[in-house]
């Protein structure tokens, strides 16, 4: 009997069945609690299971409920709402980050198995987009915030996005909302792997970080920051002209604070039409080998729209920035859970790409 019912849903609402199956498998309460026991440091379970907190927060993140307080009566949690908030405000950032990594690993396995990847941007390299996010200012619900007009910034994060898989591989959360993005790069550097290709905006054009990537046999394409020092080795050479702009390149030398030197390629795109920020040229630095065409390098950077689009989807489709939560750890946990939900959605999109290979699934399938 149940198989007939399931078959009807599979036929009439296949995506809904896929989402339900993924949620039941990847966010299964027993599995999540078992995972939590393996990663927790100072936290403990006591009255409220970690899986219950995940389920509660997902109701808010997925816009099923407007706030934690509204979701609480429907959560099945028997502990008081005060205990729930206490649990949320003490969640370790390593747990929030670890959950994103855990689900990303599961997503990568599934997407690879079904061959649902997007076409690679550059064969032989694992392209990773890096970008930052500052959570929006929160309401003044906490007593400590009621004496100030300014909204408190509950945190900041760096996100690593894989365009081939279409998922967030990692999130690096920070409780200091006013911290500079570059201050979080040391943690990101520990995750760099051989043949990675990190594509980044100028905020991440930091010599120590770029040299760390290079030292680990990985590569970078980064927009040059105005304060980044370099030594030209040859004049700019015109590579090509097009209707949108002219492409130039020159070899330059960069020197690390330690005195180490590397030769990189400086790519200049002179635009015929200014960007929305008024820029008439874009300057890139890369340590990719000479056999990689200059136009490909410019195209790699242009594809940063993929991570920008992912952030836009997170903001418009999910409640990723819970401005009702003044507790930094709680707000950052909500942000990380939004990426967990996004990655589950990415698996569904990958399955559709694998099934309908001759169709532009990313452009034609409605996300609602």
Predicted features along the sequence, with ranges:
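Single, function-defining residue in the core of a domain
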Residues: 1-65, 79, 84-91, 98-106, ...
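Short alpha-helical "recognition helix" segments of helix-turn-helix
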Residues: 69-75
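Primarily marks folded extracellular/lumenal domains of secretory and cell-surface proteins
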Residues: 110-116
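Extracellular beta-strand-rich solenoid/capping regions of secreted or surface-exposed proteins
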Residues: 146-148
């Amino acid at each position: 009997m149940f198989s007939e019912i399931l078959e009807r849903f599979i036929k009439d609402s296949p995506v809904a069945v896929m989402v339900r199956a993924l949620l039941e498998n990847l966010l299964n309460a027993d599995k999540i609690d078992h995972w939590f026991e393996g990663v927790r440091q100072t936290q403990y379970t006591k009255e409220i299971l970690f899986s219950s907190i995940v389920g509660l927060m997902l109701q808010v993140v997925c816009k099923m409920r407007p706030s934690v307080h509204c979701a609480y009566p429907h959560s099945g949690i028997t502990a008081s709402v005060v205990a729930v908030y206490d649990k949320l405000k003490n969640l370790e950032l390593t747990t929030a980050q670890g959950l994103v990594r855990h689900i990303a690993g599961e997503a990568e396995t599934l997407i690879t198995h079904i061959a649902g990847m997007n076409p690679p941007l550059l064969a032989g390299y694992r392209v990773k987009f890096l970008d930052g996010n500052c959570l929006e200012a929160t309401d003044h619900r906490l007593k400590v915030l009621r004496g100030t007009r300014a909204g408190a910034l509950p945190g900041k994060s760096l996100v690593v996005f894989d365009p081939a898989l279409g998922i967030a591989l990692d999130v690096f959360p920070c409780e200091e909302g006013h911290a500079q993005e570059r201050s979080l790069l040391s943690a990101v550097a520990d995750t760099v792997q051989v043949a990675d290709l990190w594509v980044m905006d100028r905020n991440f054009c930091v010599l120590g970080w770029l040299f760390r990537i290079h030292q680990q046999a990985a590569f970078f394409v980064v927009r040059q920051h105005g304060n980044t020092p370099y030594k030209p080795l040859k004049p700019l050479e015109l590579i090509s002209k097009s209707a949108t702009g002219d492409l130039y390149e020159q070899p330059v030398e960069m020197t690390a604070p330690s005195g180490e030197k590397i030769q990189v390629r400086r790519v200049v795109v002179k635009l015929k039409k200014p960007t929305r920020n008024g820029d008439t040229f874009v300057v890139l630095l890369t340590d990719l080998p000479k056999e990689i065409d200059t136009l490909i390098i410019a195209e790699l950077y242009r594809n940063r729209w993929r991570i920008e689009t992912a952030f836009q989807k997170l903001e418009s489709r999910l409640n990723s920035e819970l401005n009702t939560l003044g507790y930094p750890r709680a707000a950052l946990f909500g942000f990380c859970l939004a990426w967990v939900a996004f990655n589950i959605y990415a698996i569904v999109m990958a399955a559709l790409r694998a099934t309908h290979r001759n169709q532009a699934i990313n452009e034609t399938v409605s996300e609602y």
